[in-house]
Amino acid sequence: MAGSADELVSLLDLETLEVDLYRGAQARTERQRVFGGQVAAQAVVAATRSVESRFVLHSLHSYFLRPGDTTVPIVYDVERIRDGRSFVTRRVSARQHGRPIYYMTANFQVPEPGLEHQDRMPEVPSPEQGMPLVELARSRGPEAAEHWEREWAALD
């Protein structure tokens, strides 16, 4: 779908209101509540903007507290918990109507070699070899495809 990537990029390009305070735009949607992945992604962007570029996201913990309102922008307040040489910690509060809808604690680390704590990824077909989601929706009928295009095309 033309413009979908641009729409996603603009959704993740938060407006800076003040130091460590950002406003996130809302996606065009027919849903009654904000998609949780949107809130989490915008919170990661807000936290990332408060750390030096040498740090990468290492871990995060999220708490979805209330449903988000799709008609109102979300304000992200970043709190700088810790600034170390190797690790940085941020807490992000996403707010609407003066109340928190989401909390996230994110840890960033300077990349370094270390122990591997997981198995290697098994050999699987590449994404290009899989069926595009829009085709899967079309296989379920024109209404499903139309709904998918409206709501999710920017994320595909």
Regions found by a protein language model. Give the residues of each.
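Terminal targeting signals and extreme-terminal segments of soluble enzymes
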Residues: 1-156
